[in-house]
A protein has these predicted regions:
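Short amphipathic alpha-helix
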Residues: 13-25
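A short, well-ordered alpha-helix in the C-terminal region of glycosyltransferases
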Residues: 327-341
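Active-site-proximal region of nucleotide-activated glycan assembly enzymes
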Residues: 112-174
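Donor-nucleotide binding loops and adjacent catalytic segments primarily
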Residues: 41, 46-50, 172-178, 182-259, ...
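Conserved nucleotide-sugar phosphate-binding/catalytic loop shared by glycosyltransferases and other
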Residues: 3-11, 30-85, 156, 307
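C-terminal alpha-helical cap of glycosyltransferases
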Residues: 340-358
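Glycosyltransferases and closely related glycan-assembly transferases
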Residues: 83-96, 104-119, 132-137
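Conserved donor-binding/catalytic loop of nucleotide-activated donor transferases
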Residues: 114, 252-255, 270-279, 298
Length: 358
């Protein structure tokens, strides 16, 4: 079977695409997979690194408000759809799968033009424009969260990397602590703003470094590739990294996480059983707050608004949490209990079934 996977721009679209590609190849090694993306997104690097072919279409911004970009959308859409049609006619997929974002719209339109089965996967709690459109063209619709409103939606969860979904944090703990230069006798707060970092999170946690050290809380702080941070690391380590290739080791080293609440982050953090302090990104249509809501409601995390995250808040809240092992254990178990870790294979089977029924 030939499958065309469309998605990219951010890690939120690219990561589940790659996880699904892996699951398709596990379930049916004969599956031929082609990815559709842009030159500007993360997929331009990550898809080839995963050993998958990447076809390029022009970037298609979908403006949320009136303005010059909105006026240019029709011509950009025609160009992107024409490019997607050329790929579809050349690759001849049996099924087209979209993960949302700029790339999915021309993929959906090209698939409909050629009467191909479409599978839509929505990663966020609130669907974006692309997947609202795609869901009107198919009955094969998968969502990550139970309250996402799309026609024909089936909750599959969010596909994540097997490296994460199958990891044993306890078995990796010793290796992880040594890898990052952390002490094994102190609780560890993992701080990350996602693939691009987060200035607000960086400033708030680093500003409370002294209070965290005084409480005996060590920090593993992934600041992002575009951010720098100068924090003195003393007897209680405060480790600053721009990027971490082995997030499984970062999760194994952590006792709790302070992070954004993109769908991929929520799924990975909760899925491995880590309690978290979620700081939703205050843009878009509020989907990050809703992404974290099932975990919060289950007792697996805390939610703090971006504007409320200050060094003072961190100093007043984090030490008490990190030095309470029973509370951490309860929160971790609650988080782990609500996240499906086999979403990659569930979605892959949906894709294979849709393609076979053509």
């Amino acid at each position: 079977m030939r499958v065309l996977l469309a998605g990219g721009g951010s890690a939120g679209h690219t990561s589940p695409l790659l996880a699904t590609a892996d699951a398709l190849r596990r379930l049916d090694p004969a599956t031929e997979i082609t990815c559709l993306g842009t030159r500007e997104g993360l997929e331009a690097r990550l898809v080839p690194e995963a050993g998958l072919p990447l076809e390029i279409v022009p970037r298609l911004p979908l403006p949320r408000r009136p303005g010059p970009d909105l006026l240019r959308t029709p011509s950009r859409l025609r160009a992107a759809r024409a490019a997607a049609l050329e790929v579809v006619d050349r690759v001849r997929p049996d099924v087209v799968v979209g993960f949302g974002g700029y790339v999915s719209v021309p993929a959906y339109l090209a698939a409909r033009r050629r009467s191909l089965p479409i599978v839509v996967h929505e990663g966020n709690a609130i669907p974006g424009i692309a997947n609202k459109l795609g869901a009107r063209m198919t009955s094969h619709v998968a969502t990550s969260f139970p309250d996402t409103v799309l026609p024909h939606a089936v909750v599959t969860g969010l596909p994540i990397r097997r490296l994460i979904s199958t990891m044993d944090r306890g078995a990796l703990r010793t290796e992880a602590m040594a890898s990052f230069g952390l002490r094994d006798d102190l609780p560890t707060l993992l701080v990350t703003g996602g693939s691009q970092g987060a200035a607000r999170i960086n400033a708030a946690v680093s500003g409370a470094a002294g209070d965290l050290a005084a409480a005996g809380v060590q920090v593993l702080h992934v600041v992002g590739p575009k951010h720098g941070l100068d924090v003195a690391s003393g007897e209680v380590p405060y480790v600053v990294l721009n990027y971490v290739d082995r997030m499984d080791l970062a999760y194994a080293a952590a006792d709790a996480v302070l992070c954004r609440s993109g769908s991929n982050t929520v799924t990975e953090v909760a899925g491995v059983g880590l309690p978290a302090i979620y700081v939703p990104l205050p843009i878009g249509n509020g989907e990050q707050s809703l992404n974290a809501r099932p975990v919060i409601d289950a007792g697996g995390g805390l939610l703090v608004a971006d504007a409320a995250l200050t060094p003072e808040w961190v100093a007043a809240t984090v030490p008490g949490l990190l030095t309470d092992p029973d509370r951490l254990a309860g929160m971790g178990a609650a988080a782990r209990g609500i996240i499906p870790l086999d979403a990659d294979e569930i979605l892959a089977r949906m894709i294979l079934d849709a393609g076979a029924a053509r």
